[in-house]
Amino acid sequence: MEIKRDRYLNKLISFMWDGQVKVITGVRLCGKSYLLRNLFRAYLLEEGVPADHILSFELDLTRDIRYRNPLELANRVREIVENQREQFYLFVDEIQMSDEVPNPYNPDGKKITFYDALNDLKSLSNLDIYVTGSNSRMLSSDILTEFRGRSDEIRVHPLSFAEYYSAVGGDKEDAFENLRAL
């Protein structure tokens, strides 16, 4: 069963390659990751983007735990993207799990955060950046403040009945009762 979130998908599509960090915010479990990793990824693949040009880091998974370090993330992405002519897409899911790390050049100074890494990566003209996270306070206030004028917010809401019904179909009253039982 695929749940269409066309309103949000179309918003992401409209923001493509605008030079901004796309920040997908919303309450927990409202479909931010699904929108990015399933719907938007499928759109890119249908448009002919090679799968290996979609760089995806899921910071809540152990396989990507090293990329919670913003320096590791930035270095890995630069390794892949820098000096390439092709366009790449960067998806960072659960960005609130990223760490702050000491600055190796100024250990007593301000720590390096994911804002620093994203700002650095934003300078790559062949990279389009998308991030999600569950801590909506951190994302919607902190990152949008940090990137004032340099980010687009896509605020995702829980499923509407119309979205739910479009996925399950059948009798509307039965669908409504099933939804209430969830």
State where each predicted segment sits.
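Pre-Walker A adenine-sensing motif
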Residues: M1-G19
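Hydrophobic anchor at the beta1->P-loop junction of P-loop NTPases
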Residues: I24
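P-loop (Walker A) phosphate-binding loop of NTP-binding proteins
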Residues: V27
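Walker A/P-loop
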Residues: S33
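Short glycine-rich substrate-engagement loop in P-loop NTPases that contacts/grips substrate
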Residues: L55-E86
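Structural recognition of the conserved hydrophobic beta-strand(s) that form the central parallel beta-sheet
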Residues: F91, D128-S134, R155
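Conserved Walker B catalytic segment
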Residues: Q96-Y130
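Interdomain motor-coupling "hinge/lid" segment immediately C-terminal to the ATP-binding subdomain
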Residues: S140-L182
